[in-house]
Swiss-Prot record:
InterPro entries: Ribosomal_Su5_D2-typ_SF, Ribosomal_uS9, Ribosomal_uS9_bac/plastid, Ribosomal_uS9_CS, Ribsml_uS5_D2-typ_fold_subgr
UniProt organism field: Rhodopseudomonas palustris (strain HaA2)
UniProt-recorded name of the protein: Small ribosomal subunit protein uS9
Record SUPFAM superfamilies: Ribosomal protein S5 domain 2-like
Higher taxonomy: Bacteria, Pseudomonadati, Pseudomonadota, Alphaproteobacteria, Hyphomicrobiales
GO function term, MF aspect, one: structural constituent of ribosome
Transmembrane intervals: none
Domain of life of the native organism: Bacteria
A single Gene Ontology CC term: cytosolic small ribosomal subunit
HAMAP family reported for this sequence: Ribosomal_uS9_B
Keyword hit for Nucleotide-binding: no
Amino acid sequence: MSETMQSLDQLSALKTTQPDAPTYTKKVDKFGRAYATGKRKDAVARVWIKPGAGKVIVNSREVEVYFARPVLRMMIQQPLVAAARAGQYDVICTVAGGGLSGQAGAVRHGISKALTNFEPELRGVLKKGGFLTRDSRVVERKKYGKAKARRSFQFSKR
């Protein structure tokens, strides 16, 4: 860039060389399933999705049995509803660690990532909805000299 800019028009006329947006390809195994792992708190979910009638199996059990609370089942369905693919994919997942809320969040994260592996064009919709972002909030550790992470022991003035 040896010549100097004289106006803003010249600056906007310059073509900036930006790298092209990365292209995502369909990643499917020999059985026609897309695989992804999802994490939330201490829970880790391994998720496989394939085209089907919309059945969801969690740890070899129906989703209604494993996640009895409707809020948790709704959390799991959110990525499919946001992508307008509810009832079009069968979901099989194994989840371990954490409690039920963390496990539901891990399954939701895994379903979102598996959907992008199966249909890369859904990535924008799921990213905008915040389903592909790993929720990094974990339990704060307990500190010595304290009763819990932040709670102090009872203080007596006299």
